[in-house]
């Protein structure tokens, strides 16, 4: 286990944002040889945005709907997460996220500058920045992948509302402990001792893989 998962006071949580488009997305499918399957598609570029938090050790998934991605929506999603999924007494969440600019600004305000208005977040959350350009190290990317495979690819949605309702129902299946996302999100660089956590003087937490 990594130091993050060995530390009984820290609960690792992977975070990421995603857009799902109402416009039909096409991927491979079974079809009779020589046929030309057709799927209707809604014109336009309407989409719905989600911010997701997955706990790999249990498969629990929590999603929020930020509307758009900026540092304010990141801060709000942190607060919604700890409100929806309160941290057990004596423990803190360790949010693991990528280097998106809106993440970095939220981190600067919450932890680097340690502004008093964000003390509620610091009391419940620490963070880890993944190495740059490494989406393969964030297992919630796999959650988005299977969501598209199971619920949006090759499917026609006549309205953004119908797409949103479909996604909300699907994500709600994983709110509690479940084997599907647990098995999906457990991977070697998370479980093995090759991953270590380091803290610098400013309190910023980084992860290195060796």
Predicted regions and their residues:
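Short functional hotspots at interaction and active-site rims
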Residues: 1-210
């Amino acid at each position: 286990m990594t130091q993050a998962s060995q530390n009984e006071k820290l609960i690792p949580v992977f975070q990421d944002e995603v857009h799902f488009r109402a416009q039909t997305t096409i991927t491979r499918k079974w079809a009779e040889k020589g046929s030309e399957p057709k799927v209707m598609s809604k014109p336009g570029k309407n989409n719905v945005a989600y911010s997701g938090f997955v706990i790999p050790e249990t498969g629990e998934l929590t999603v929020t709907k930020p509307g758009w991605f900026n540092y304010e929506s990141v801060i709000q999603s942190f607060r919604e997460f700890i409100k929806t999924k309160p941290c057990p007494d004596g423990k803190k969440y360790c949010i693991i996220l990528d280097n998106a600019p809106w993440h970095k600004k939220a981190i600067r305000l919450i932890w680097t500058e340690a502004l008093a208005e964000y003390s509620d977040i610091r009391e419940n959350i620490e963070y880890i920045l993944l190495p740059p350009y490494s989406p393969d190290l964030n297992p919630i990317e796999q959650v988005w992948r299977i969501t598209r495979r199971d619920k949006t690819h090759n499917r026609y949605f006549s309205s953004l509302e119908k797409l949103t309702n479909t996604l909300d129902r699907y994500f709600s299946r994983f709110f509690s402990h479940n084997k599907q996302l647990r098995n999906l999100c457990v991977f070697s660089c998370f479980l093995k001792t090759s991953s270590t956590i380091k803290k610098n003087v400013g309190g910023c937490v980084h992860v290195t893989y060796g």
